[in-house]
Regions:
Chain B
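Catalytic Walker B motif of ABC-type/P-loop ATPase nucleotide-binding domains
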Residues: 186-190
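A short, flexible loop at the N-terminus of ABC-type nucleotide-binding domains that lies
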Residues: 11-29, 33-53, 58, 91-96
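ABC ATPase nucleotide-binding domains
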Residues: 259-285
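ABC ATPase C-loop
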Residues: 178-179
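The feature captures the beta-strand-to-loop junction immediately N-terminal to the Walker
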Residues: 60-62
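Helix-to-loop junction immediately C-terminal to a conserved catalytic motif
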Residues: 75
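Conserved ABC ATPase "signature" region
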Residues: 124, 139-157
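Conserved ABC transporter NBD signature motif
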Residues: 83-91, 100
Length: 369, 285
């Protein structure tokens, strides 16, 4: 009897370690394929005309891929080794935009997923909790009023986001926070910052400044290069790494505050720490791409609908699905309108909004995480 | 069977077993005054509360008598205004949150409905206090979870999602989670309320089995005084935020108590076993 039990125990052991389900693997593979295909389409078009074959050859050009010097120059900004014009166009102008798309997609999705667990709220996202509007305001203020600080725009955006979330947390704090108070405070702070943004537009006397500002506030990958990759890659990796490791904490947090506390979690501390990680992730994206609307809200829902609500799976799914959707949306933003490029935030808003409504109509249990 | 010997001033009672040896208390509340930030004045005042070691103690009382508040204070969910709570002689404050969760398991009255989690995953969350931030599950975790699932008798629904279970099955799943925590002391807030009779018994039998086999100390809030009288080793009767009486059910449960505390007229039969037969509500309440 004891033997039979222990055998059962081992069987369960094997089962436990495979929280990775077939659906998840398939989902991640599909996302990767979408990312690669969208990326290839992206690098094939542009003002410098190349055939598909030429472009793809340049992408998979072994002399670039396996050239350590080239990578050093990409990632650390040192002098670029000699390469063909095709390689330069693809590797220096078009591919980095895809990479920035991958990074922002992954970080925004992860950020939204964390915020949804921390506040236990379907509607939570970097948006709702003030991060985006705070960052947007900081950017606008820099462009319009303190234009001398423009080189530090990414940093300022991150600071603005952190500050806004700090205000939200402070308002919501009353001997502890609750998800509902967090979201309510977020909505209010959002409103205030958005009014401030709109007010600032009246002080902008240069149309160019206004356009730059609008691109920031709607989120755009236009003109991003290795510079942006360099800024974003490290904090992105750190925040995604912590988010993946913290997935189990998020699962426990989802059981409810009382249960989490009974199980020995220091709820406030964990919630604050993971919120910090989510802000870092969102700030990374905002710093290089501006405020891409809807993304952090919708992607976790799409993933949740496919792989289920377990955060260990959800996080992994977000890391793959975020890039796929962002790169695809950016293809639309860059190529759909022919000559003119739209901000990618316009595309994500236009597609994400209706898709979210569709999910809402389709899923009976949308109200539950 | 245990007996109480009351001091003359009736303030302090000491529980002894048949040989007159004092029974240790697993949990002691001393000079407790409890209130919520929103309430004016204390909700519960209690000079001394003992939860005897290796026994099942039931907290009973009408709605709003302060049972849940008292339980929150005992489980460190509510900081007392004055007074201390000690577990095995040590102050609750001296434990870190995780250390405490290894000593004391708590099941709250309302558990947020969480649809998309399998029963087994839920039970594994009970191992949280035994794991570090980056730790995976080890053999001890698996054993504890298997034992908890077996004790609660929910093996056949272990892969089912919580959202698809009945209220009774859900409650058993939550109880299994607390059991997997593997603590010496267990506090349960109304685990049988809203359950059908079958599941009420399954919950109570699980608790009883745990107590008898593992010597786990249990404090449980029960809504039904008749059930509590039959089930528990000791009763703590609460009334208006104060301890009305406490001790073995045979001594605590009287027709007077049922009238004073619960506002009902009832017949109490002591032979062949303790039985409460409620008759009607008393008019003046």
């Amino acid at each position: 009897m004891a033997e039979a039990e222990s055998v059962g125990g081992y069987a369960a052991t094997e089962q436990r370690d495979s929280w990775v389900t077939g659906t998840l693997v398939l989902f991640c593979l599909a996302s990767t394929v979408v990312t690669v295909v969208a990326g290839l389409i992206q690098v094939s078009f542009g003002e410098y005309s190349m055939t598909f074959l030429q472009a793809w050859k340049a992408v998979f050009n072994p002399t670039v891929i396996f050239d350590l010097n080239a990578w050093v120059s990409f990632l650390f900004g040192t002098e670029r080794p000699d390469m063909s014009t095709n390689s330069i166009v693809v590797w220096n102008l078009r591919l980095p935009r895809v990479f920035v798309g991958i990074i922002t997609g992954a970080t925004l999705a992860v950020s939204g997923a964390i915020f949804q667990a921390v506040t236990r709220n379907e509607l939570a996202s970097p948006f709702i909790l003030g991060v985006s509007s705070g960052a947007g305001f900081a950017v606008l203020a820099t462009l319009v009023v303190f234009s001398g600080l423009a080189p530090f725009l990414p940093l300022i955006a991150a600071l603005g986001g952190t500050l806004a979330f700090g205000v939200v947390y402070a308002i919501a704090w009353k001997g502890g926070t609750s998800p509902v108070r967090l979201v309510l405070a977020g909505v209010i702070v959002n409103m205030v910052f958005q009014s401030l943004q709109q007010g600032l537009f009246f002080f902008a006397d240069d149309l160019g400044v206004v356009q730059t500002a609008i691109a920031w506030i709607t989120g755009s990958l236009t003109g991003t290069g290795w510079e942006e990759v360099r800024i974003a890659i490290l904090p992105a990796l750190i925040s995604i790494g912590i988010a993946l490791a913290g997935a189990r904490q998020l699962n426990v947090l989802m059981l409810g505050e009382n249960t989490a506390r009974s199980l020995g979690m220091r709820v406030e501390r964990v919630r604050f720490f993971l919120s910090g990680v989510a802000i870092l992730a969102a700030s990374v994206a905002i710093a290089v791409a501006g405020v891409v609307s809807f993304f952090g809200l919708v992607v976790p829902h799409i993933v949740r609908n496919t792989v289920g609500g377990d955060y260990r799976r959800l996080m992994v799914g977000c890391v793959f699905a975020g890039p796929a959707l962002m790169v695809t949306a950016d293809v639309g933003a860059r190529l759909a309108m022919g000559g003119t490029q739209m901000p990618v935030g316009v595309v994500t808003g236009l597609i994400g909004g209706p898709y979210f409504l569709y999910l809402m109509r389709k899923q009976q249990s949308m109200g539950e995480l | 069977m245990a007996r109480t010997q009351r001091n003359t001033d009736r303030e302090r009672t000491r529980i002894t077993d048949d040989n007159g040896v004092a029974i240790e208390s697993a949990l002691v509340g001393d000079g407790l005054e409890l209130s919520y930030p929103s309430s004016d004045g204390p909700v519960v005042e209690c000079t001394r509360l003992d939860i005897p070691e290796e026994a099942v103690t039931a907290l009973v009382g009408p709605n709003g008598s302060g049972k849940s508040t008292l339980l929150k204070a005992l489980s460190s969910h509510l900081e007392p205004d004055t007074g201390t709570v000690r577990i095995h002689g040590e102050n609750l404050d001296s434990f870190s949150q995780k250390e405490l969760a290894r000593e004391l398991g708590v099941l709250s009255q309302e558990n947020d409905s969480l649809g998309s989690i399998s029963v087994e995953d839920l039970v594994y969350h009970g191992r949280y206090p035994h794991r570090g931030f980056f730790d995976g599950t080890d053999e001890a975790d698996h054993r504890a979870v298997e034992r908890a699932i077996e004790l609660a008798g929910i093996d056949e629904i272990r892969d089912t999602e919580l959202g698809q279970l009945s209220g009774g099955q859900k409650q058993l799943a939550w109880i299994a989670m607390v059991l997997a925590q593997d603590t010496d002391v267990l506090l349960l807030d109304e685990p049988t309320t809203f359950l059908d009779v079958h599941h009420q018994f399954r919950v109570l039998e699980t608790i009883r089995q745990l107590n008898e086999e593992k010597g786990v100390t249990v404090a449980v809030i029960l809504h039904d005084i008749a059930q509590a009288a039959r089930f528990a080793d000791y009763l703590v009767a609460m009334h208006d935020g104060e301890l009305y009486d406490w001790g073995p059910p045979e001594e605590v449960v009287t027709e007077q108590l049922l009238a004073d505390v619960f506002g009902i007229e009832a017949v109490v039969e002591y032979e062949p076993e303790l039985q409460v037969l409620p008759k009607r509500a008393l008019p003046d309440r």
